């Protein structure tokens, strides 16, 4: 059985969360059974892990600890929310998934993509999105968006140096080259309506199939 599992990736401030919300509303209006969720989080246990990972006071957190916590949250979220929804025939829209760990911990933290893949292979088994959409934006612009958005709580990753976020973007570029069939890029600097159109053009053929 083919599951309609989509993930959305990008640096901080890329606008993917807004697009996920717009997609959920659009699909619901068309009477498509859809679940929108996020990582880390989406369910109670994973939200508690999220709070630990992203708390600004936890700047001493070791990179491997961070990677393992993300994988633990991912596992619980997957078995408790994502897999049941997919088995029920629902479309799942996930704001971040494994590629965040590959870009942030694998590349930006310097742990290595293959090492993070190994950790996450244990966590997710064979459950992978059929399509991952990467929202590309210059990190300085993304961080400026966050500063301008007074309703968004600043977390530990937002407080990293610009050089860290530049490495995250570099990591995503590596992933685009490594997984070209699954990961597709959209220009997140465009007006939000154009970004939505580009995203929908990628998703619609898979949903209508």
UniProtKB/Swiss-Prot annotation:
InterPro entries per UniProt: P-loop_NTPase (IPR027417), Thymidylate_kin-like_dom (IPR039430), Thymidylate_kin_CS (IPR018095), Thymidylate_kinase (IPR018094)
Residues annotated to bind ATP: 10-17
Superkingdom of the organism of origin: Bacteria
GO cellular component, one term: cytosol
Function: Phosphorylation of dTMP to form dTDP in both de novo and salvage pathways of dTTP synthesis.
Keyword Nucleotide-binding: yes
One Pfam short name: Thymidylate_kin
Catalytic activities: dTMP + ATP = dTDP + ADP
Family assignment from sequence similarity: Belongs to the thymidylate kinase family.
One GO MF term attached to the UniProt entry: ATP binding
GO biological process: dTDP biosynthetic process; dTTP biosynthetic process; dUDP biosynthetic process
Enzyme class: transferase
Name used for this protein in its record: Thymidylate kinase
EC number: 2.7.4.9
């Amino acid at each position: 059985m083919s599951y309609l599992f989509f993930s959305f990736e990008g640096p901080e401030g890329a606008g993917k969360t807004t697009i996920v919300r717009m997609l959920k509303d659009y699909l619901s209006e068309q009477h498509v059974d859809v679940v929108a969720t996020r990582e880390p989080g989406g369910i109670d246990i994973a939200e508690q892990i999220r709070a630990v990972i992203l708390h600004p006071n936890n700047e001493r957190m070791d990179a491997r600890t961070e990677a393992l916590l993300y994988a633990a949250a991912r596992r619980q979220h997957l078995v408790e929310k994502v897999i049941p929804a997919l088995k029920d025939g629902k479309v799942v829209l996930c704001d971040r998934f494994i590629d965040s760990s590959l870009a942030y911990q694998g590349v930006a933290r310097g742990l290595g993509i293959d090492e993070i893949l190994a950790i996450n292979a244990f966590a997710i088994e064979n459950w992978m999105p059929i399509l991952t959409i990467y929202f590309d934006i210059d990190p300085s612009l993304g961080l400026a968006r966050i500063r301008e958005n007074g309703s968004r709580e600043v977390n530990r990753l937002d407080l990293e140096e610009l050089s860290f976020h530049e490495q995250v973007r570099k990591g995503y570029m590596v992933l685009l080259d490594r997984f070209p069939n699954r990961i597709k890029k959209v220009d997140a600097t465009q007006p939000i309506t154009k970004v939505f159109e580009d995203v929908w053009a990628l998703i619609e053929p898979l949903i209508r199939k």
